[in-house]
Regions:
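The feature captures the beta-strand-to-loop junction immediately N-terminal to the Walker
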Residues: 13-15
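Short coil-to-helix segment of the ABC ATPase nucleotide-binding domain corresponding to the Q-loop/switch region
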Residues: 65-72
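Conserved ABC ATPase "signature" region
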Residues: 72, 76, 83-101, 152-153
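Conserved signature/switch motifs of ABC ATPase nucleotide-binding domains
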Residues: 104-107, 125
Length: 166
């Protein structure tokens, strides 16, 4: 049992196979707990929801789309108007250090850049809780350090609640 307050950053560490990703998948609503329940804001989690955003170990991007098309995917599904979408995409690409890459196909990006696209795609939807499943695991040491700093910066500036599996 654990409680996470709004605006906290929880890092879950442990060896392979100990259940870190299972915990995250239950929190995301992808799996159901075998016993007990999990709640967010007093509401039981029974499936995926827009109040939770997920960043996977591998970017899970649509490689046939551009960076901007990947980032704005959720807003397009919500039918947010194009002008608002374009403005938000520009803002988040600048925050994650990808200003000027909006028209670049994601398959042309390095692993670290792809993870920043995935992070922007999650954050642009303004989720209450951000779930990160080993987003730094496939990155080289220098890129990992930069990505850690970026996640901390975003956490401090936005006050988002984050669960980070590593």
């Amino acid at each position: 049992t654990f409680k996470l307050k709004k605006g906290e950053l929880l890092t879950v560490l442990g060896p392979s196979g100990c259940g870190k990703t299972t915990l995250l998948n239950i929190t995301a609503g992808f799996l159901r707990p075998t016993s007990g329940k999990i709640t967010l804001g007093g509401n039981e989690i029974n499936g995926p929801g827009v109040e939770r955003g997920m960043v996977f170990q591998q970017g899970a991007l649509f490689e046939w789309l551009t960076v901007a098309q990947n980032v704005n995917f959720g807003l397009r599904m919500k039918k947010v108007d194009q002008k608002t979408t374009e403005k938000k995409v520009e803002e988040w690409l600048e925050i994650v250090g990808l200003k000027g890459f909006g028209n670049t196909p994601t398959y042309q990006l390095s692993g670290g850049m792809q993870q920043r696209v995935a992070l922007a795609r999650c954050l642009i939807n303004d989720p209450e809780l951000i779930l990160m499943d080993e987003p730094l695991g496939a990155l080289d040491a220098l890129t990992r350090e930069k990505m850690q700093s970026l996640v901390l910066k975003i956490w401090k500036e936005t006050g988002k609640t984050i669960i980070l599996i590593t």
